[in-house]
């Protein structure tokens, strides 16, 4: 087996991942899957900004990244959060290497809108060769969502979009958004499979709402590229039974589901 899975773990769930989740990751790697992880860190960035009394503001739900905010974000993402994740993987006998999107110029970006958002990037190019080399040697690259411009200016990037871009560049078989819910629920029931059009309808109907909307939108963005399938899974429980994955699968067309 030679399949690739990219996990995206949000900052709010990283410290709540279950032992079962890590055991599943180890089992997938042992079964021959090549794995990569992209993580966020929003809550911990907020906490550190408050501790250091660095002023911040949000524009359209997105943190405006001034230079002082960028320095804290890089410290937290590449330092605290990234190395915590690497340590937790090591505790579960999983070899990983913590990097950011700056390493190997993996994520090349331009300013999204410097006047409005500050040092926030929009990804223009992905160079996954360094991460793929690690995966070939059975290391899991744990990637913090930071990027650089062609002039080597550091920019913060949205972790969901970073994961989608990395998965597309790697032509991953699956992109998994690891959350604290089982997947997409409708009337309290887990939806096993949702097509692109069904997902858009569920958003319009308000069934997909709140923080799930950007994840589903990122999933749809990934599907428009080279990713075959996106899943929303629960990192607080089991995501893999040994034969099947647990969660909601988002696919282009149901006819394509095997």
UniProtKB/Swiss-Prot annotation:
Record field: catalytic activity: N-acetyl-L-glutamate + ATP = N-acetyl-L-glutamyl 5-phosphate + ADP
The protein's annotated pathway: Amino-acid biosynthesis; L-arginine biosynthesis; N(2)-acetyl-L-ornithine from L-glutamate: step 2/4
Q: Does the keyword Cell cycle apply?
A: no
The record lists substrate as bound by 41-42, 63, 156
EC number(s) on record? Answer: 2.7.2.8
* Xref: InterPro entries: AceGlu_kinase-like_sf, AcgluKinase_fam, ArgB, Asp/Glu/Uridylate_kinase
- Extract the Pfam families matched here: AA_kinase (PF00696)
GO CC annotation, single: cytoplasm
A Gene Ontology biological process noted in the UniProt record is: L-arginine biosynthetic process
| Annotated GO MF terms | acetylglutamate kinase activity; ATP binding
Query: What enzyme category does the UniProt record give?
Result: transferase
Q: What is this protein called?
A: Acetylglutamate kinase
- Originating organism: Bacillus pumilus (strain SAFR-032)
What does UniProt list as this organism's lineage? Bacteria, Bacillati, Bacillota, Bacilli, Bacillales
State the encoding gene. Answer: argB
């Amino acid at each position: 087996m030679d399949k690739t899975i990219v996990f995206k773990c949000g900052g709010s769930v990283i410290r709540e991942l279950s032992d079962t989740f890590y055991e599943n990751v180890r089992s997938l790697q042992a079964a021959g899957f090549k794995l990569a992880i992209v993580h966020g860190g929003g809550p911990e960035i907020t906490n550190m900004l408050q501790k250091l009394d660095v002023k911040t503001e949000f524009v359209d739900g997105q943190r405006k990244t001034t230079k002082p905010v960028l320095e804290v974000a890089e410290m937290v993402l590449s330092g605290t959060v990234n190395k915590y994740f690497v340590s937790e993987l090591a505790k579960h006998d999983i070899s990983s290497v913590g990097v950011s999107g700056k390493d190997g110029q993996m994520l090349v970006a331009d300013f999204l809108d410097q006047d409005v958002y500050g040092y926030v990037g929009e990804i223009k190019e992905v160079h996954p060769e360094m991460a793929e080399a690690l995966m070939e040697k059975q290391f899991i690259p744990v990637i913090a969502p930071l990027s650089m411009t062609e002039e080597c200016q550091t920019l913060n990037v949205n972790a969901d979009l970073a994961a989608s871009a990395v998965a597309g560049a790697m032509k991953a078989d699956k992109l998994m958004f690891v959350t604290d819910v089982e997947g997409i629920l409708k009337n309290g029931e887990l939806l096993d499979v949702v097509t692109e059009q069904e997902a858009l309808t569920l958003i319009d109907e308000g069934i997909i709402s709140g923080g799930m909307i950007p994840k589903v939108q990122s999933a749809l963005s990934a599907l428009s590229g080279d990713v075959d399938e996106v899943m929303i899974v629960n990192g607080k429980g089991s995501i893999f039974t040994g034969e099947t994955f647990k969660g909601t699968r988002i696919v282009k067309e149901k006819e394509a589901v095997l």
